[in-house]
From Swiss-Prot:
It comes from the Bacteria. It holds the Pfam family Pept_tRNA_hydro. This is Peptidyl-tRNA hydrolase. The active site is at H19 (proton acceptor). Its EC number is 3.1.1.29.
Amino acid sequence: MHLIVGLGNPGSQYELTHHNIGFITVDAICKYWGFQLFSKKADYLITSGMINDNKIMLIKPYSFMNNSGIPVAKIRNFYKLSLDNIVVIHDDADLELGRIKVKKGGSSAGHNGLKSIDSFIGNDYWRLRFGVGRPEDQRSLADYVLSKFSNFDNVTPLVEKIAKNIHLMLQGDNTAFINLIV
């Protein structure tokens, strides 16, 4: 079993923001692979289904970014999941918009959602880093990541490619995964 976590913030004011690319991507995975709609738990939304022969749980923590580790730890502990079977999809301002990197472990690089997860389960899980870039104007990074994409249509094809090919990452074929989405 694998757990795919999409990071973001709940609420309509955060929809289609840079910081919510994790939510956006797990929604696309859910749709592409025909999972049931998400159901609401105390502090997260969850659904499950199959990708090829693998049981997959998708979650969107609804505890706000800074507390994402709480629901992730609950699910990990309940299902006794190995960190090798956890993938966290998150925005990364250090990567240019549309650039993707797959990485296991490492620091949070200042990302509060990752800091929270690290504090509850450690940092040796998989990350799908979705580049959102940095502001080109005088806005702070915090204001930028909480702003909506200026042209979401430019992001949609990449999100769809990730959804279609996520099975390769789950199989451990990160090279094929990256080659098919770039």
